[in-house]
């Protein structure tokens, strides 16, 4: 476009094209101007031209992306380091926000990878049904016995007494090819054979393997082009059987040895190894292996080194060699990036670029809404014939005073009475199956047992061990907490994101395909706040970064098993850098460069969290944790939550040998789930500072988070959270005080916010002091005896009898009276703002701090009281400060960065 020369050159910095007035009709422009006061069109009709249309002298300036090939690479056992030479030519500006690492490699997700529920092989077979098979007798000298179904009805004949498969074009009989015929999937399609029509002869195939395998989940690979499975160098033998003592054989079976595998099932009821080839081995019970999706973490958390000692990246100008990336152990790069994304976009939408699919869980699994089942109508199943095949009857007719048989009419099958049927409660079965698969299987390991005659590895972090353990029946069942909305207490402290219903992980796993071995081609963004959005001015720079190869850190699995032990490996073959120059004209770029070279126009970047984090160890079963006294100068407040030690890696090393876990890492990805375990926090300063919280409801230096016994009515929302704590969270997150019914706007109530995740719960429980109350053990619970199984995957046991469970709700003698309340608040960091008035953070001075707390250093003590957890945990505290990087590029090839982290005056939070 022709631009009037009077416009300043920097107007081209707006890269979205022409203004509407420059290409729309004069009449439309005049109308827009005349109605602008009450109908503002603004720039709705701006021309979407992106690149400049004049003063562009080279094709390179117009190019969208450039690929930089590394000048040096270092591939070690635990990391892959690359170095790039960034050459930014004159009159150009490199947009660091557009850069990403393009990484190719190969991935072995290990033997524990199973991207589906159930089994892929014979999934409709009963779980304890055997294949057609032979089994040994107690006396090994006696011939093997057979249990089989001869489904292929045909005549036995020919020179070799084979099963006739049909006739050829000359109407001559064709007999079975023993390598694959008769095929096990073939039989009679109608229902009359065997019931109304007599089957004279039939045949099938039988396994003669030395051990028995249930049909459910059994698989054998083909050994010939017809689908036969006979093992190489073995022969098919024919076995003939008849029901009487005389006559021709009625059935023939082609016995073979085959390599039968169970790739996605395991035994949950097994007999001793010595009996598995005998009749006892026929009733072994199979169950599917648990699903285990494996993929890269959300937004590639853990792949690039941050907060990692000497392994941080480098961005340095060749003229000065000053590194713009400063090594700070307690920067929150990954978590800060996760929360920044969640507050700027809808994280419920998945996007394959950058691997964006946030970890989630099914709320119906975390908090069970047990309203029973709608099973008013019975569910029947009927025989295929639709009638009862009764005894064979003769047709008769009246002949004077007697009844006589009708000639040639003796094949009548008459059933008497109602049609026989079987009943199954589908609704109850589906509900209990849901509870078992989604809740019971994820119970803590101390509430599970190893089935008899099953050997599991001693390493409890392996997939084989986790897969082989079964939960005790009765802990999670259809009658537990019936009529209420309640999370099972034993599951509250179990990571709900390590679940096969984590749709984000499932999506990221499926992006890589459904195979254990795969090639990957990924695009990884830079997250470090100081250089993530930098405008890089002309010069030559060294850009270096390291990428982890530890599978537990960069991959995520459903069960959180140790992927190193279970065989997962990653191999990086190439890393390239893609970057874009701003599509500006040379004159515009040079003007922008001159502006940014001036030290008054330095680029400043704030870390999104702007906090110094601390991890304080909490011993198992501890309920009190005092934080050592430390000095402070000024800060905005605290954010805090609780982490499990086994789920928190040591970020300072490329390979943490003690990190034997691959589930979500709350420390990095924000999947917090232990916030509900805090009871109270007390904060004390030295005597020279007055605590700025006298307008709160409770004592000035103590925040009571939840109260179990609430005699004075301090709790809120039918939960055990105090009104005091609820008010503090509303003020800290939304600046909303106690003003009646008032909810935060949508843009404030995103993924990690307080109200978005606050789940209050209430139920009534029996009073143990009531007469007739017995604290029955789990093994004494009668859960529909005879019609279900005692240990959910084992064979059914028992006989019909009344059930033992909670007393009826309507029984006045044993009514559920004692209230029990609690809450969950996953993903949320508790926040305590530091201000004299929680409804206002105060006015900032030109120094960027509130004068109220810009004091000299003072001692600070904090004491936490929390629920006991029987494993080591960590208190995660974010001291909210002002975390700023100021970037100065005074000359060509020179980049200088000053990191300003106020207010701490001592310790590793000081830059």
Swiss-Prot record:
Modified residues annotated as N-acetylalanine in this record: 2
Modified residue annotations for Phosphotyrosine: 899
Induction: Expressed in the late phase of the viral replicative cycle.
Protein localization: Virion; Host nucleus
Swiss-Prot/TrEMBL site (Involved in interaction with pre-protein VI) positions: 737
Domain of life: Viruses
Annotated SUPFAM superfamilies: Group II dsDNA viruses VP
Major localization class: virion
GO terms, biological process: microtubule-dependent intracellular transport of viral material towards nucleus; symbiont entry into host cell
GO-annotated cellular components: host cell; host cell nucleus; T=25 icosahedral viral capsid
GO MF terms held by the record: structural molecule activity
Keywords attached to this entry: Acetylation, Capsid protein, Cytoplasmic inwards viral transport, Host nucleus, Host-virus interaction, Late protein, Microtubular inwards viral transport, Phosphoprotein, T=25 icosahedral capsid protein, Virion, Virus entry into host cell
Family the UniProt entry places it in: Belongs to the adenoviridae hexon protein family.
Remaining remarks: All late proteins expressed from the major late promoter are produced by alternative splicing and alternative polyadenylation of the same gene giving rise to non-overlapping ORFs. A leader sequence is present in the N-terminus of all these mRNAs and is recognized by the viral shutoff protein to provide expression although conventional translation via ribosome scanning from the cap has been shut off in the host cell.
Described purpose of this protein according to its UniProt entry: Major capsid protein that self-associates to form 240 hexon trimers, each in the shape of a hexagon, building most of the pseudo T=25 capsid. Assembled into trimeric units with the help of the chaperone shutoff protein. Transported by pre-protein VI to the nucleus where it associates with other structural proteins to form an empty capsid. Might be involved, through its interaction with host dyneins, in the intracellular microtubule-dependent transport of incoming viral capsid to the nucleus.
Oligomer status and interactors: Homotrimer. Interacts with the capsid vertex protein; this interaction binds the peripentonal hexons to the neighboring penton base. Interacts with the hexon-linking protein; this interaction tethers the hexons surrounding the penton to those situated in the central plate of the facet. Interacts with the hexon-interlacing protein; this interaction lashes the hexons together. Interacts with host dyneins DYNC1LI1 and DYNC1I2; this interaction might be involved in intracellular microtubule-dependent transport of incoming viral capsid.
Name the UniProt record assigns to this protein: Hexon protein
Lineage: Viruses, Varidnaviria, Bamfordvirae, Preplasmiviricota, Tectiliviricetes
